[in-house]
Every structure is written in structure tokens, then in C-alpha cells.
Swiss-Prot record:
Organism: Clostridium kluyveri (strain ATCC 8527 / DSM 555 / NBRC 12016 / NCIMB 10680 / K1)
HAMAP family: SurE
EC number: 3.1.3.5
Pfam families for this protein: SurE (PF01975)
One example GO MF annotation: nucleotide binding
Protein name according to UniProt: 5'-nucleotidase SurE
Domain of life, source organism: Bacteria
Cofactor (UniProt): a divalent metal cation
Function: Nucleotidase that shows phosphatase activity on nucleoside 5'-monophosphates.
Residues binding a divalent metal cation, per UniProt: D8, D9, S39, N97
Catalytic activity: a ribonucleoside 5'-phosphate + H2O = a ribonucleoside + phosphate
């Protein structure tokens, strides 16, 4: 397959380079990433003409073509798909992010936003994030999980009408201690560290069986996302409210 790799940590980040080494073995890979660290940039895009500069760079130990872009992660995803990939990218993989993107933090994440931008460009995508706060982390473990998700997803998901974004979060544990992969919804709790610090029982919080819930228990978490922001639950009520005579 023809893949685009991007991130928000920048073209020189370890995560994207480890990801490239794993994926370029059996796929055609193009790398397009910000020239500098862009974490927390959300879905920001560049609107001023001429401010985006694309420069080809050589990454040590990587055979794939790589491009440094003076823009945001969302810029990189769009330029990668539309311009560098000539609208012939089969899938975009964003990451590996230095740190989790769990719960509401996904809204602030440049890594997740790049994946969503790919879906807006009608290209399925996977955002990959790794817990690095434990200190003894290994990007190779996250890359292996990403490759596993990619392999299953590309072969078995046939609904081409759905521009799906998958968000994968991998805990900071040795490979043999990760309990497995859980497909789950995204939680709403703000910042995982708050939960750790408070020491509250998870059964008492609203994130049961969410991405936060599972990674705290040693699982990798996989959540399907979409960019339709409509609140369908109250859409009819609001319509009735404003059409009453």
C-alpha cells in the first residue's frame, strides 16, 4: 500500500522515524511532518499564502522520501495527501506521539487532528500515541501495535464510504506485560494525570470502559473517531424549538 506518515512532534522525532522503519518494509511510504515541534496545535491550519515551505530531507536509516513542512500537523496531512501523494495515498498514519492522546485531550492533539484531516481528505487514517511518562518506554512496541492494527484494518474493513479515523493508545509497559487490545469509546475526563494523582476508584468515575479506563489497566486502546460534530440527540428538539409558531 501507499502510505503517508505524519505527526505533531516534528520530522526529527524518534516516534515517526521508528514508525517509518516498521512500515517501509512492505509498503511505499512518504513522510511529511512539521519542521519543528507542534504538539498541542489541535486542528490549526495555515491560511496565509506563501507561508508553507516544503523541503525534502534525508532521515538516517530510512529509505522513504521525507519532507519537512513549515506548517501544522493538519497542513502536513493535507499537503501529504493532496500534493506529495498526488491524491493516491491509501492510508495516513500519524505518530508515534510522545505521550497519550486520551479522552478530551484528543481535541488538542496535533497527532489526532492530522489523522482527522486525512479523513477529511477522504483517506482513512490511524493516530498512534505512546505513554512516555514512565521513562522506560519503547517506540518499537507502539509501532508493532500500529502495524497489527493496520494489517487487520486494511484487509477486513471494506466500507469505503466511511472515512474512518482510528486512535491507538499504547501504555508504557514491556510488550509481554500489555494485556491486549481493547476497542472502546473515548472518555471525557480531562488529563489522565489528574486521575492518577487523585487516586480515585475508577468505578466511581465516568470513564468506565473508555480509552482512559483500559490503558490505566495495562491494555492498548483503539477508538474509532469521526469529525461530524452534530449533536443528533437534541437535533430534533432544537429544530422543533425554532420552528414552533
Amino acid at each position: 500500500m501507499r502510505l503517508l506518515l505524519t505527526n505533531d512532534d516534528g520530522i526529527m522525532a524518534e516516534g515517526i522515524q521508528v514508525l517509518a522503519k516498521h512500515f517501509e518494509k512492505d509498503n511505499e511510504v512518504i513522510i511529511a511532518a512539521p519542521d519543528v515541534q507542534r504538539s498541542g496545535s489541535g486542528h490549526c491550519i495555515t491560511t496565509v499564502p506563501g507561508e508553507l515551505i516544503i523541503q525534502e530531507v534525508k532521515l538516517e536509516g530510512i529509505n522513504s522520501k521525507a519532507y519537512s513542512i513549515t506548517g501544522t500537523p493538519a497542513d502536513c496531512a493535507r499537503l501529504g495527501v493532496r500534493k506529495l501523494g498526488n491524491n493516491q495515498i491509501d492510508m495516513v498514519i500519524s505518530g508515534i506521539n510522545n505521550g497519550f492522546n486520551l479522552g478530551i485531550d484528543s481535541l488538542y492533539s496535533g497527532t489526532v487532528s492530522a489523522a482527522i484531516e486525512a479523513a477529511i481528505c477522504e483517506t482513512p487514517s490511524i493516530a498512534v500515541s505512546l505513554d512516555t511518562k514512565g521513562g522506560n518506554y519503547d517506540y518499537n512496541i507502539a509501532a508493532e501495535y500500529a502495524l497489527e492494527v493496520f494489517s487487520i484494518y486494511k484487509d477486513k474493513y471494506k466500507n469505503k464510504d466511511e472515512n474512518v479515523v482510528l486512535s491507538l493508545n499504547v501504555p508504557c509497559l514491556p510488550r509481554e506485560k500489555i494485556k491486549g487490545l481493547k476497542v472502546c469509546r473515548v472518555g471525557f475526563k480531562y488529563h489522565l494525570q489528574e486521575i492518577y494523582d487523585k487516586g480515585e476508584k475508577t468505578e466511581e468515575l465516568s470513564y468506565n470502559y473508555t480509552d482512559i479506563y483500559y490503558v490505566k489497566r495495562g491494555y492498548a486502546a483503539l477508538s474509532p473517531l469521526h469529525y461530524d460534530l452534530t449533536n443528533y440527540k437534541i437535533l430534533g428538539d432544537i429544530n422543533n424549538l425554532f420552528t414552533e409558531k
